[in-house]
Structures are given as structure tokens and as C-alpha cells.
């Protein structure tokens, strides 16, 4: 080993099991940060969810074998995992964890290994979710339907009238229901709809879906990406129907915007973007 190369020990707990769990927790944190920046596709989001479930289960099992003073939560392990990554990749590229050493440390002639220069790489460009505008600029003079304190019969009639007169183009639907003290969300949908000769309405593109709680706090944000473009007519029709089916069923139970939001988000596998509290409501 070259004299100028050292091994930096990171406190991860005894044994490779803790090192592995903590490192995977760091990977989970990276996945979550990518998700916050809309940088994960659907398979990536699925891997995030599976990794989180796996880690939660493994940590729960592992903690049972540890003294109470040494048990760590997922969040604590994330912090250690991120520290491991920083030391390995950025602060000291030649570092080792729990006695494991990079290949370039084992071969002194390879001390200028290009893989150790990752700290010089710029961060991935992109906007954070909070930097994205609440309302898209490209929706000019949209048709807007607002349902507030209406019974189901009136709500269905208003939806029917507005949808039947809408030709095509940008469309905005706002649902705000608070009937009989039933908590609801305000759901705002921006999309481009096509009207076909057979009378079908198809959603060609979903630009945005925002869901707000009663205090106006944004609890779900689905922003348009290439993955949200609906290319199949039947898929578009199915998604559009999910917006209105609860009004057309005619049941007496008050229609809840939260259910509509979950229905639309689930079409894209994005229902996790609703907080558990709002999802339950």
C-alpha cells in the first residue's frame, strides 16, 4: 500500500451487518432525495419503496438482537450511511470502511485511479420541487369547474353540463367539497383533453395535479413529465373517467375530493404523494 494512502474508519457499529444496513440506509436517503427532485422514473420509485420496506423490516429484526442502548432507527442509520458515502466518495476517496479497502489502495501503482476523483464532479442539475411554480403558465383561459357545498345531484349535473360543452384543449377542474362536515381536499387538475366524434373525452396530457388540505397547504403535487403523457386513447378515457365516476355513481354518500385525488394519482402509481393523514380523509 502506498505510504500516502490511509484508511479512514467510520463508526458504523460492530460487524459487516451494521455496515451493510447503514450503507443501504444511505442509498435509501439518496433515492429519496432524487425522488424529491423528480429525478426518479417509475421503476426507480418502485425500487425506493421496496428498499424502504426491506430496510424497515431488517432493522426491526436486527434491533431485537442488540442491547437497547445500541438500537438505531432508520433515520439514524441514514445519517451514518450518508457519512460513509461522503468519506468514501468525496472527503477521502481512498478511505476504507470497517477494514474494507478500495482496489486502488491495494495496488500502489494505481494511486491516480480516475474513480477516486468523483469529488470533482459537479452536482446533478435540476430544480427542487419547491422551486416549481404552483400553477402552470401554459394554461390560458381554461374551462374551470368549482364544486363547493353542493349535493351530489347538483354536482353531477354541473359536471355533465361543463364536460359536454367543453370542446378540446386545456381544462382545469377544481373540486372543493365540505358537505356535512366531511373533510375534503381541494384538487386542481390541469390537462389537455380531446373530444372525439363518438363523444368520448380523452386526456392526452396531464400537466399537473395539485391537492390541498382545508388550510390551503399543498399535500400532493403531481407535475407533468414525459411519463405522464397519455398516448393510448383508452388510457386517457379511463383516467378522465376516474375524475367523474364518483359523481356518476349516484350513491348518497358525500363525494370526497380526497378519494378523487387518490384515484387519479393511482393511475400513475403516484398515490404515495398523498400524506397518510390526507389519504385517510
Swiss-Prot record:
GO molecular function: protein serine/threonine kinase inhibitor activity; RNA binding
Alphabetized UniProt keyword annotations: Host cytoplasm, Host nucleus, Host-virus interaction, Inhibition of host innate immune response by virus, Inhibition of host interferon signaling pathway by virus, Inhibition of host ISG15 by virus, Inhibition of host PKR by virus, Interferon antiviral system evasion, RNA-binding, Viral immunoevasion
GO biological process: symbiont-mediated suppression of host ISG15-protein conjugation; symbiont-mediated suppression of host PKR/eIFalpha signaling; symbiont-mediated suppression of host type I interferon-mediated signaling pathway
Residues spanned by motif Nuclear localization signal: 50-55
Coiled coil: none
Entry keyword annotation includes RNA-binding: yes
Keyword Plastid: no
Subcellular location(s) of the protein: Host cytoplasm; Host nucleus
Pfam families: Flu_B_NS1 (PF02942)
GO cellular component, one term: host cell nucleus
InterPro entries in the cross-refs: NS1, uS15_NS1_RNA-bd_sf
Signal peptide: none
Region: G1P2-binding, residue numbers: 1-103
Chief subcellular location: host cell
Sequence segments annotated as region (RNA-binding and homodimerization): 1-93
Oligomer and partners: Homodimer. Interacts with and inhibits human G1P2 conjugation by UBE1L.
Protein family: Belongs to the influenza B viruses NS1 family.
Protein's job: Binds and inhibits the conjugation of the ubiquitin-like G1P2/ISG15 protein to its target proteins. Since G1P2/ISG15 is an early antiviral protein, NS1 may inhibit the host antiviral response. Prevents EIF2AK2/PKR activation, either by binding double strand RNA or by interacting directly with EIF2AK2/PKR. Also binds poly(A) and U6 snRNA.
Name used for this protein in its record: Non-structural protein 1
Amino acid at each position: 500500500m502506498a505510504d500516502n494512502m490511509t484508511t479512514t474508519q467510520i463508526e458504523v457499529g460492530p460487524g459487516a451487518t451494521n455496515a451493510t444496513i447503514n450503507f443501504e440506509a444511505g442509498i435509501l436517503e439518496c433515492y429519496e432525495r432524487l425522488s424529491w427532485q423528480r429525478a426518479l422514473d417509475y421503476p426507480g420509485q418502485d425500487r425506493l419503496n421496496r428498499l424502504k420496506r426491506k430496510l424497515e423490516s431488517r432493522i426491526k429484526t436486527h434491533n431485537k438482537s442488540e442491547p437497547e442502548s445500541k438500537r438505531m432507527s432508520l433515520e439514524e442509520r441514514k445519517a451514518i450511511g450518508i457519512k460513509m458515502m461522503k468519506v468514501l466518495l468525496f472527503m477521502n476517496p481512498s478511505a476504507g470502511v470497517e477494514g474494507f479497502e478500495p482496489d486502488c489502495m491495494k495496488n500502489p501503482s494505481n494511486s491516480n485511479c480516475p474513480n477516486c476523483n468523483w469529488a470533482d464532479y459537479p452536482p446533478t442539475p435540476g430544480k427542487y420541487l419547491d422551486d416549481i411554480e404552483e400553477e402552470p403558465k401554459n394554461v390560458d383561459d381554461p374551462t374551470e369547474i368549482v364544486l363547493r357545498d353542493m349535493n351530489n345531484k347538483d354536482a353531477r349535473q354541473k359536471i355533465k353540463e361543463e364536460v359536454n360543452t367543453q370542446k378540446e384543449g386545456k381544462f382545469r377542474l377544481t373540486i372543493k367539497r365540505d358537505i356535512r362536515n366531511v373533510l375534503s381536499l381541494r384538487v386542481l387538475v390541469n390537462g389537455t383533453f380531446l373530444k372525439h366524434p363518438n363523444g368520448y373525452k380523452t386526456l392526452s396530457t396531464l400537466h399537473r395535479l395539485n391537492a390541498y388540505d382545508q388550510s390551503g397547504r399543498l399535500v400532493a403535487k403531481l407535475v407533468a413529465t414525459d411519463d405522464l403523457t397519455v398516448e393510448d386513447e383508452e388510457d386517457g378515457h379511463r383516467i378522465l373517467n376516474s375524475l367523474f365516476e364518483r359523481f356518476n355513481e349516484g350513491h348518497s354518500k358525500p363525494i370526497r375530493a380526497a378519494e378523487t385525488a387518490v384515484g387519479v394519482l393511482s393511475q400513475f402509481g403516484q398515490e404515495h404523494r398523498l400524506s397518510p393523514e390526507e389519504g385517510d380523509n
